[in-house]
A protein has these predicted regions:
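Short charge-dense sequence patches
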Residues: 22-30, 53-56
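Zn2+-dependent cytidine deaminase-like catalytic core
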Residues: 4-5, 39-96
Length: 96
């Protein structure tokens, strides 16, 4: 096992997840890994039931809407919903 290669691979997967975001200003992806297996992933976006518009224009600038959920929150919520534990897991995030 090559840790540097594994880290690079998980970051690439997080980048792919970021591409799923509808955000125009900043797309963020997240992967949660435990025992060398991906147990969850997510991206920033609007909550279920909202439109997929993550920004609003204020004074000519795109501003992230307050309802946007972080990629980490989405990944952890999916993990918990499916009954998994994040104890001992690593999280890879494309933006900090």
């Amino acid at each position: 096992m090559d840790i540097k290669k594994d880290n690079a691979m998980y970051m690439q997967i997080a980048q792919i997840a970021a591409g799923r975001s509808y955000a125009k200003r900043l797309q963020v992806g997240c992967v949660i890994v435990k025992n060398n297996s991906i147990i969850s992933f997510g991206w920033n976006g609007m909550p279920t039931g909202y439109d997929n518009c993550c920004e609003e224009e204020i004074d000519g600038k795109l501003v992230t809407r307050k309802e946007v959920q972080h990629a980490e929150l989405n990944a952890i919520a999916k993990l918990a919903y499916n009954g998994y534990s994040s104890h001992g897991a690593s999280i890879y995030i494309t933006h900090s």
